[in-house]
Amino acid sequence: MTWRVFAQDDAPRLRVREWQHNARQFFETDLEIRDPHGAVAKIAIGPSVREIRGRLRDEDDLRDALEIENARGNGMYDLAERRCGSVWVVEREGPDDRAALVIAAVIASVCLGPILGDGALFGVRTAREKLDELVSPYR
């Protein structure tokens, strides 16, 4: 189970300082990057560690994103998906994996692309709403 985060970089690159800055500023979270090697690293948020892998966007990524967009009928991210040359794949331990969603949202906030997973395509704002639901499911 993963999140795929579209990135407007032609090739994946670890943007450690920017990710750490946005994690602190917008998510009140500290990210620790461990074992960086090329476009692969482990990211720790407290005791939770998730692997991320950057790669070039492929046709399956675009097809999956456009399929969801077409089903919703709003074309909200269509241009962003097409501008994104790379994708970050964020490891998840399950559907309620808060750490993985924070990591995906932080990457999306820097790389300016949507997040794809669980049959949905969404941006940082929706990710923040999902995070709020994970913290307090009984509102």
For the regions a language model picked out, list residue spans one by one.
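Acidic (Asp/Glu-rich) sequence patches and key acidic residues
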Residues: 1-139
